[in-house]
Curated annotation (Swiss-Prot):
The lineage of its organism: Eukaryota, Amoebozoa, Evosea, Eumycetozoa, Dictyostelia. It comes from the Eukaryota. It holds the Pfam family DHHC. This is Putative ZDHHC-type palmitoyltransferase 3. One of its GO terms (molecular function) is protein-cysteine S-palmitoyltransferase activity.
Length: 502
């Protein structure tokens, strides 16, 4: 009886020691892994059941789990730094908003100002030789066009194109950190469980650690160890860990381990499939546009943390989602969207008119320079003709006039005014050609109520454009902001309807 009491006391002591060690392990999980930081997100992982066949808990040290956790959190933190949320690249000053690239914006102003200064200072005074009214009209027309050009240029460059406000970036960062911690706990538990199962497969820890020779006492010891293990690992709050007592035979241990591995792999595969389905479902939202059969897919923007509204796209240069995004214009240094497309269209059209005007007037001035100037070679020829007027023929007159005109043109090109005329003619021709293609392209887009990126991606290629309401109504919408409420909806609100009237 005394021996049995001593053995029972030893068994109880061992149970108490195991319970204390298991409590310490639970504290390690709570303090270092951060299991209880986000109870809402923890529910996503409560359905994962891990089956663990445990031996003697004395074989495991307290620092093993914490070391595994620290390694896994470091890996996840490195991934989080790579996916760090970038801030917007747009520049804000009171109500002025512009993009980050300002070098080409300065070049655009130089391309407009330099030819204009040469034209106003050097060439417009030549029109006085033709007519006084022509000189005054040149000053009025050129200055008026320059005012319209720079007004639309600066308004387009410093107007908010329709940037969609982001969700709170700090909250999204905290959510990502919490998710990485939960993923780290998952990896740590998997490593801890698989390492324990490998040890059990090699030998029987409980039978080797038993200090008693009687079979009855061994049975009592095994029952005590299994009950204490179940009590200590019972529903930790995030994961359900089931403890099973191994049998004495190694064959049964290996069979149980194989079955447990298969069950765990099946559960993991099912959970991965469910997570992938949830990601695919939450990546897009389909919305029907008006009464048409066209369904617009609103994509979720990871950077801005919101669902993009119809016809909205993310600009990689400014790092913003923009309403009715058309394109990012490098020459203006800003995105072209719902709020500044009208000014962009007016800018390119007025610049085209100005380039054509400079081209035509430079040709007129060059003709005037050629007619009013006479080369020294022509003066010598005229003196020779006057001295030999008796031998003068009509056939020679045509040749002499042609030679005179060529000599006068070559001589005029050597002068400052003639060289500037040639420069402005070449510059105006190139700018008129490029801007002519650009303006004609945007006229076609305006009449069909499409944007540049929609035409480039061919979104409405195989179906009718639901936003096309006729060329007259499209002109009112695009160029006069008449009833421009295509995107008057908050797609990120759960209470919004899936039917948008265009």
């Amino acid at each position: 009886m005394v021996n049995n009491n001593n053995k029972n006391n030893k068994i109880n002591d061992r149970e108490n020691e195991e319970n204390e060690k298991n409590k310490k392990k639970d504290k390690i999980y709570e303090n270092k892994i951060g299991i209880n930081e986000n109870n809402n997100e923890n529910n996503n992982y409560q359905n994962e059941n891990f089956i663990y066949t445990s031996g003697d808990s004395n074989d495991t040290q307290e620092g093993d789990i914490s070391e595994i956790q620290e390694e896994s959190t470091n890996e996840n933190n490195k991934k989080l730094k790579k996916r760090k949320i970038k801030k917007t690249k747009s520049l804000y000053f009171y109500k002025c908003v512009t993009g980050p690239d300002k070098l080409f914006f300065i070049v655009t102003q130089i391309f407009i100002l330099v030819p204009s200064l040469f034209f106003e200072i050097k060439l417009v005074p030549i029109s006085l030789e033709i007519s006084k009214k022509l000189e005054i009209s040149n000053y009025i027309i050129t200055l008026t066009l320059l005012v319209f050009i720079f007004y639309n240029l600066y308004k387009c460059a410093f107007t908010n194109p329709g940037i969609i406000t982001r969700n709170n970036i700090e909250e999204s960062k905290k959510d990502k950190i919490k998710l990485t911690k939960l993923q780290a706990t998952k990896k740590a538990l998997k490593k801890f469980i698989t390492s324990g199962m490998d040890e059990i497969a090699n030998d029987d820890p409980i039978s080797s650690s038993s200090d008693f020779s009687d079979s009855d006492d061994d049975d009592q010891d095994e029952q005590g160890g299994s009950s204490s293990a179940r009590n200590s690992f019972e529903n930790s709050g995030d994961f359900i860990v089931e403890m099973e007592q191994p049998t004495n035979s190694n064959n049964n241990n290996s069979n149980n381990n194989n079955n447990n591995n298969k069950n765990r792999n099946r559960n993991n595969n099912n959970n991965n499939n469910n997570n992938n389905n949830n990601k695919n479902q939450s990546k897009y939202k389909e919305i029907q546009i008006g009464d048409s059969d066209f369904k617009y897919k609103c994509k979720f923007c990871i950077t801005c943390g919101l669902y993009r509204e119809p016809r909205s796209f993310h600009c990689s240069t400014c790092n913003n989602c923009v309403e009715n995004f058309d394109h990012h214009c490098v020459w203006i240094g800003n995105c072209i969207g719902r709020r500044n497309y009208r000014e962009f269209f007016y800018f390119i059209t007025t610049t085209l008119i100005y380039a054509l005007y400079l081209l035509s007037m430079s040709i007129v001035f060059l003709n005037q320079i050629v007619n009013t100037t006479e080369s020294p070679a022509n003066k010598i020829n005229n003196n020779n003709i006057n001295s030999n007027s008796s031998n003068h023929n009509s056939s020679n007159d045509l040749n002499e006039k042609f030679e005179k005109s060529i000599n006068n043109i070559l001589y005029a090109l050597r002068t400052t005014s003639g060289g500037l005329c040639i420069f402005i003619i070449i510059f105006g021709f190139i700018m008129s050609l490029l801007l002519g293609f650009l303006v004609s392209y945007h006229i076609r887009l305006t009449l069909s109520n499409k944007s540049t990126i929609e035409d480039f991606k061919k979104i409405f290629e195989n179906q009718i454009n639901p936003y096309d309401k006729g060329w007259l109504f499209n002109l009112k919408i695009k160029l006069f902001n008449f009833n421009n409420s295509n995107n008057n909806i908050n797609i990120n609100n759960n209470n919004t309807n899936n039917n948008i009237n265009s």
